[in-house]
Amino acid sequence: MAQETNQTPGPMLCSTGCGFYGNPRTNGMCSVCYKEHLQRQQNSGRMSPMGTASGSNSPTSDSASVQRADAGLNNCEGAAGSTSEKSRNVPVAALPVTQQMTEMSISREDKITTPKTEVSEPVVTQPSPSVSQPSSSQSEEKAPELPKPKKNRCFMCRKKVGLTGFDCRCGNLFCGLHRYSDKHNCPYDYKAEAAAKIRKENPVVVAEKIQRI
């Protein structure tokens, strides 16, 4: 008999049918289902007093809110009417300076934009003769100068020498007989040229003076 009484009962499933094992302490439900059950009870307990309170106070609160809204609208309409009448009765001198300035600037802009736009006729400019003159002078300057004919006659006897002529330092062309300076009385000064050349090639050497102590 003692053995039969000590035997523990077998595991029982959750009463909600979730498939987990239940516990007799949690009304035969598992821990998860029991927590959900408690949360539902708490939520239902909170909602019920709020619903009753709102149901009892709804008619009076609605009527009071409607009356307040009507009074607010009446006050707004009265204030708007008074402000409009005041604005109509305010003289021009009482307006702020900034508003007067803006009105003056707008009127000036209207006056500037209103004048009729005159159609401007196209102006045709004709080239003046003074402009063409420099171009003609420039063209004349750019024209190549004609080469001077080369001298091919002797300056003394006027004999044709061709390529066998001799140029003198005086700038003339002579034949074989008159190429010497004494034959054609050459005006070029050979002595002065030679003296200048000698001075250039042989500068004067002067010793430095001895400074006495």
Swiss-Prot record:
The keyword Zinc-finger applies. The keyword Cytoplasm applies. Its main location: cytoplasm. Zn(2+) 1 binds at residues 14, 18, 30, 33. Residues 40-66 have a biased composition (Polar residues). It comes from the Eukaryota. The modification Phosphoserine is found at residues 48, 58. Induction: Up-regulated after TNFSF11 stimulation. Expression also induced by other cytokines such as TNF and IL1B. No significant inhibitory effect on the NF-kappa-B pathway is observed. Expression is increased in both denervation- and fasting-induced muscle atrophy. Pfam families: zf-A20, zf-AN1. It is found in: Cytoplasm. Zn(2+) 2 binds at residues 154, 157, 175, 178. Zn(2+) 3 binds at residues 168, 170, 184, 186. A zinc finger (AN1-type) spans 148-194. One of its GO terms (molecular function) is DNA binding. A zinc finger (A20-type) spans 8-42. Residues 139-148 have a biased composition (Basic and acidic residues). Residues 39-149 are annotated as: Disordered. Expressed in brain, muscle, eye, and heart, lower expression in lung, kidney, and spleen, and very low expression in liver. Expressed in myoblast C2C12 cells (at protein level). Residues 120-138 have a biased composition (Low complexity). One of its GO terms (biological process) is platelet-derived growth factor receptor signaling pathway. Disruption phenotype: Resistance to muscle atrophy accompanied by abnormal accumulation of polyubiquitinated proteins in skeletal muscle. Involved in protein degradation via the ubiquitin-proteasome system. May act by anchoring ubiquitinated proteins to the proteasome. Plays a role in ubiquitin-mediated protein degradation during muscle atrophy. Plays a role in the regulation of NF-kappa-B activation and apoptosis. Inhibits NF-kappa-B activation triggered by overexpression of RIPK1 and TRAF6 but not of RELA. Also inhibits tumor necrosis factor (TNF), IL-1 and TLR4-induced NF-kappa-B activation in a dose-dependent manner. Overexpression sensitizes cells to TNF-induced apoptosis. PANTHER family: AN1-TYPE ZINC FINGER PROTEIN (PTHR10634), AN1-TYPE ZINC FINGER PROTEIN 5 (PTHR10634:SF26). The A20-type zinc finger directly binds polyubiquitin chains and associates with the 26S proteasome. The zinc-finger A20-type domain is essential for inhibition of NF-kappa-B activation. Homooligomer and/or heterooligomer. Interacts (via A20-type domain) with IKBKG and RIPK1 and with TRAF6 (via AN1-type domain). Interacts with ubiquitin and polyubiquitinated proteins. Identified in a heterotrimeric complex with ubiquitin and SQSTM1, where ZFAND5 and SQSTM1 both interact with the same ubiquitin molecule. This is AN1-type zinc finger protein 5. It comes from Mus musculus. The gene is Zfand5.
